[in-house]
Structure formats: C-alpha cells, structure tokens
Amino acid sequence: MSSDSPAAGDGGEQAAAGTSVPSPSYDKQKEKARVSRTSLILWHAHQNDAAAVRKLLEEDPTLVHARDYDKRTPLHVASLHGWIDVVKCLLEFGADVNAQDRWKNTPLADAEGARKQKMIELLKSHGGLSYGQNGSHFEPKPVPPPIPKKCDWEIEPAELDFSNAAMIGKGSFGEIVKAYWRGTPVAVKRILPSLSDDRLVIQDFRHEVDLLVKLRHPNIVQFLGAVTERKPLMLITEYLRGGDLHQYLKEKGGLTPTTAVNFALDIARGMTYLHNEPNVIIHRDLKPRNVLLVNSSADHLKVGDFGLSKLIKVQNSHDVYKMTGETGSYRYMAPEVFKHRRYDKKVDVFSFAMILYEMLEGEPPFANHEPYEAAKHVSDGHRPTFRSKGCTPDLRELIVKCWDADMNQRPSFLDILKRLEKIKETLPSDHHWGLFTS
C-alpha cells in the first residue's frame, strides 16, 4: 500500500518559498494513494480488522471521515456489523459519531436497525443520536409494496410448493431455491425470517421488486411476482435450467469466437434495453454469475440479479451520477468505481469487456490475483493479457475499447451490438471453427 510521505507533503506547501511545484505525475500518485486508502479503510472496517484500520489512521488521520457512494463512513460500516473494536478505534481518532449517510441515517440508527445492542450502548455513550430512516427518531410506518393495493403480481405463499425445493444460491440476506408455482418451476429468492423486520433489508427488497416490475425483455430474467404482505418476503422469477455463465465457463473453458459472440450479443441486447433513456438502469454488478443460461443447450442468455441496480432518470445523455461506492464484484469492477469517482452507465460496459475476455480466454481476468487485488491492479492502469488464439483482432479491439480507463471513450451497448453483428458476419460457424484453429 502506498502512502504520502510527510516530507513530500510539506514540500508542496512550501512551493512559494522556493521548492519546486509537484509534477502532474506526482499529483496522480497522490490521488491513487488517497483512493486506495479510502477503499482500504472501508474494506477493513467491514472485515472487522481493527489493527489494519488503526494503521491506516496513524498514517492518515483524515481517513476517519472517508465516505463511500452512499456517503457512509467507516463508522457506519462497523456499527452496522457490530464491530466493537473497530468502532472504538474510529472514535478514538475523532470519527463523527452522528455523521449521516445519503438517507440521513446515523451510525446509531444503523446499529439499531441491525439490533446490535452492545454497539447501541457504545455509540450512545459517545453522544450518538438515532436519526434517519432506520433510527428511533424516524416515525415508523408500514412498508407498502412498490405498487399499491391488490396488484396482480402479489403471490399467495400457499401457491408456492417447496416440497421438492432445491437450493440454487445463497447470500447474506437469504437464499434462492427452485420451487413450483401453479405447477411451473420458478426461482424463489427468500429473505431470511430473521431479517424480514430489518428496515435496510426491506428497503433493498422493495427496490429490487419495484425495478423488476418495470422490466420486459427477452434477454432479461422475467419477474413473475413477489410475496410482500407476509413473511418471509419472497421474490419469484422464471427458473432457467442452464445455470449461470460462471459455472458454464468453469466446465467448458474458453469458448469459440462464434459462441462467445452469440453470448455477448444476448448480454448486450439485455443491457441496451436497461440503458435505454430516459429511465436508465445501471446494473452495477454485471458478472458471469449474474448471466443465466436459458437451458442446457446454452443457446440463449439472460441478464439477472438486480439487487444492486439503480434506476436513474436521465435529463440528458451525458449525465454523470455521484455514485462512488465500491458497489459490485471487485474482479469485474470499473476503475472509476474502485477509485470512488463519479461514474455512469459505462461501468456496465467495462464489466461486459471483462466477461467477454473471460469467455474467450477461459479464465477470469487476473485469475492469479485475489478479487480486491485484481480491482486495484485495474485501477492502476493494468489490463488482462490476451493469450487465446480464438480472440480475433476485431474482438480484441472491441474489448480494449470497452475497458478503456476513460469511461467517456467506452462505446454504448447499442454501438457494441452493431460491432458484434459485424464481427459475427466474419466468423465461421462453430462446426467449421476447428479447421481455422488446428
């Protein structure tokens, strides 16, 4: 981890007294170091690593006021998870006990929402107040479903048959199982009963349902309904028999250019739909695990999992949003997200480039790095190396454009679609491909 030396900092302030003005490269190095430390302190606060948090604060005490995209401080993060030692360290270094995030929640409000009793007592002893949507000073109101009253997507829990349920996936908020609804196999995201009263969880659940209700496209996983009036909360989508792209690539390895382009076209069609103005939906977590195969024949893909997506009303096509948190998966993360800078829908284009690279190469980008280190490597300007003979010059050029460090230089998904269609015309069918590569 790089850090700014005190001598260098003093020299910059004394430039008027005769020392030279720092070069642009020096300024860039300082910016990289600052961004890296901001990311690290939020990460270590989340991981309950008090020693690492202390080390960072000793090097740069201003990091105690670091913020992510949602304006959450390290104190918010640690308080939510109940990490006592981390919170004590942050308070020792002068953390604002009543800092408010974008929803006006204080750390105490988060601790109350997560029912962390010891944390609640600790924060109160340091003058913590409970304000925001999650706090005790917020007037409790019943949580309505995204579309009010008797909507036709509300599903009665009794209609769901879990007698032969099979686990598909599991996360911190709940699990996804294959079940049956009116005789049809479906995928059910089921929120853990212990979290069904958590306002933050309910807020995220409502957001995902509200988003999915609006989506209708052949390359987007189809929303079928939800259980919002009883516990546990459940979200029901179509069940896709082919599994996810991550598992498919793990089993198959690198794909032929023709197959990779066909897969990429499906992803790009879905993303073009999501990015359509004026209601732009930024996925923010586009990765192989969130791309699903319709069947075992793998002839059709759909984009799914909108838990981290954001619906943005665009005033003009060049709008950039103040979204600076490390939202999404590190290995596929755009550098501007990792660096906590302003970003827009082009973050999805970057992730798409990494997926297309993985489809052709047969392994994840920077597979020999841990996910966080891979994201840091990318933010420092590095990109994965092309090794596959199947990566044609046209495909390589497209990938390089899509993972450009400057988000403004990345093409739109509509442009990507046009490029892919042209590339597809130049490729042989799969059963002829071996003749060209043997």
From Swiss-Prot:
Enzyme Commission number(s) = 2.7.11.1
**Renumbered ranges of ANK repeats:** 36-65, 70-99, 103-133
Catalytic activity line of the entry: L-seryl-[protein] + ATP = O-phospho-L-seryl-[protein] + ADP + H(+); L-threonyl-[protein] + ATP = O-phospho-L-threonyl-[protein] + ADP + H(+)
PTM (free text): Phosphorylated.
Instruction: Give the binding site residues for ATP.
Output: I168, G169, K170, G171, S172, F173, G174, E175, I176, K189
Domain Protein kinase: start-end pairs: 162-427
Q: Which GO terms describe its biological process?
A: auxin-activated signaling pathway; brassinosteroid mediated signaling pathway; cellular response to glucose stimulus; leaf vascular tissue pattern formation; positive regulation of D-glucose transmembrane transport; response to auxin; response to salt
Keyword Zinc carried by entry: no
Q: Where is the active site?
A: D285
Q: Which SMART domains match?
A: ANK, S_TKc
Q: Does the keyword Nucleotide-binding apply?
A: yes
Q: Name one GO molecular function term.
A: protein serine/threonine/tyrosine kinase activity
Q: What happens when the gene is disrupted?
A: Reduced sensitivity to auxin (e.g. 2,4-D and NPA) and brassinosteroids (BRs) associated with altered vein pattern in foliar organs. Decreased vacuolar sugar import associated with reduced fresh weight when grown on high glucose containing medium or in response to cold stress. Altered intracellular sugar compartmentation due to altered regulation of MSSP1/TMT1.
UniProt-annotated location(s): Vacuole
Q: What are its GO cellular component terms?
A: extracellular region; plant-type vacuole
Function comment: Serine/threonine protein kinase which may function as an adapter protein for BRL2. Required during vascular development for the establishment of vein pattern in foliar organs. Mediates MSSP1/TMT1 phosphorylation and activation to enhance its carrier activity and consequently vacuolar sugar accumulation, particularly in response to cold.
Q: Which family does it belong to?
A: Belongs to the protein kinase superfamily. Ser/Thr protein kinase family.
Name this protein carries in UniProt: Serine/threonine-protein kinase VIK
